[in-house]
Regions:
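Alpha-helical scaffold domains
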Residues: 1-178
Length: 178
């Protein structure tokens, strides 16, 4: 990852995530990180890497998220087990929001039940992940008005949860105006 480092981008990223020490940010741009994940996901080291938690760097967490989707594109049970093992280590909004697994599209009713559990978590970014997942996958034909109450009743004083709630309602208003 250090071979992909962009020092200016590192400084920029640090300003966007004040809760992450600059020493924990390498400065790898997301398209480069995703390309790297596609290069390595078939290597045995990829599965070894996702087994080692916690990671030291912000980009390692992002790589972890990218690898999950590549390693388990069809196996929802294994994907969810690995995702739920990883979520407690997500420590910032950017890593959280980068997780948008395409596999969810094939399992919307099943994932919706998981979202309800994630919204009850004590972990800020697990709750945010649940809200962002609703935003990413359920504000189209999968929408149910119950989702509005579900998000509105999310109990958290955490800043990044409140921001996700506001974001959800802004997109819901646009996509589901009635």
């Amino acid at each position: 990852l250090f071979e992909l480092q962009d020092e200016g981008y590192r400084v920029f990223q640090a300003k966007l995530m004040p809760n992450i020490s600059c020493d924990r940010i390498i400065g790898v741009r997301t398209p480069d990180l995703r390309s790297y994940a596609k290069k390595i996901f078939q290597m045995p080291e990829a599965k070894e890497f996702i087994q080692k938690l916690p990671h030291d760097y912000y980009e390692e967490n992002n790589l972890h998220g990218a690898l999950l989707s590549l390693l388990y594109p069809e196996d929802i049970e294994t994907f969810l087990a690995e995702l739920e093992r990883f979520l407690p280590y997500v420590d910032n909004w950017a890593t959280c929001d980068m997780l948008s697994p395409k596999i969810f599209r094939k399992h919307l009713p099943y994932i919706y039940e998981r979202i309800k559990k994630w919204l009850q978590s004590d972990h800020e970014y697990t709750v945010r992940f649940g809200i962002v997942t609703l935003l990413d996958f359920y504000l189209d034909d999968a929408f149910d008005p119950e989702m509005l109450s579900l998000v509105a009743n999310t109990e958290s004083e955490k800043f990044y949860v409140k921001m996700a709630v506001a974001w959800f309602f802004s997109i819901a208003l646009v996509n589901q105006y009635e």
